[in-house]
């Protein structure tokens, strides 16, 4: 099983005050138990680290680096993927869409991944299945 991990899921796992913290923790543990391949881009990782530091402090960053990064397969964004993400962002023309999400969509299509661990409606709008359902 291969699952693409979004920033929204990683932040929900970390933050006990997040409205979806419990389902996020449960799914995270289930994916680890199944030894699922957990994939994200370096852009997702940078976004997650920046938001975690801003919202929860350096201790959250340390937790990510120590406990989460080792179980992730980080796909480094290639130049062509970056620009494909920019083109997708511009073609969608939505102010609340992010470049990080668009690059995630490009990578998911390239890798043939249909499921995303995400609490972000943009993934479903792009035709992906969000976990948890």
Tell me the role of every PLM-derived stretch.
Residues 1-39, 53-66:
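Short, well-structured N-terminal submotif of metal-dependent ribonuclease cores
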Residues 7, 28, 45, 65, ...:
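Alpha-helical structural signal
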Residues 34-38, 71-73, 112-114:
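Short active-site oxyanion
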Residues 74-115:
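Active-site neighborhoods of divalent-metal-dependent phosphate/nucleic-acid chemistry enzymes
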Residues 2-6, 40-41, 97-98, 120, ...:
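Histidine- and aromatic-rich ligand-binding microenvironments
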Residues 48, 66-79, 86, 92-94, ...:
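Short acidic, glycine/proline-enriched helix-loop-strand junctions
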Residues 105, 110-133:
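Acidic, PIN/NYN-like endoribonuclease modules and their adjacent C-terminal/linker elements
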């Amino acid at each position: 099983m291969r699952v693409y991990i979004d920033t929204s899921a990683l932040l929900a796992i970390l933050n006990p005050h997040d409205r979806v913290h419990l389902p996020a923790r449960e799914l995270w543990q289930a994916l680890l138990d199944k030894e699922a391949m957990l994939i994200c881009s370096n852009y997702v990782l940078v976004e997650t680290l920046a938001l975690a530091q801003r919202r929860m402090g350096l201790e959250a960053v340390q937790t990510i680096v120590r406990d989460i990064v080792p179980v992730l397969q980080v796909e480094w964004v290639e130049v062509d993927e970056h620009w494909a993400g920019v083109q997708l962002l511009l073609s969608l023309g939505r102010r609340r869409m992010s470049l990080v999400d668009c690059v995630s969509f490009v990578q998911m299509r390239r890798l043939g991944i249909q499921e995303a661990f995400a609490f972000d409606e943009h993934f479903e709008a792009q035709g992906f299945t969000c976990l948890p359902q």
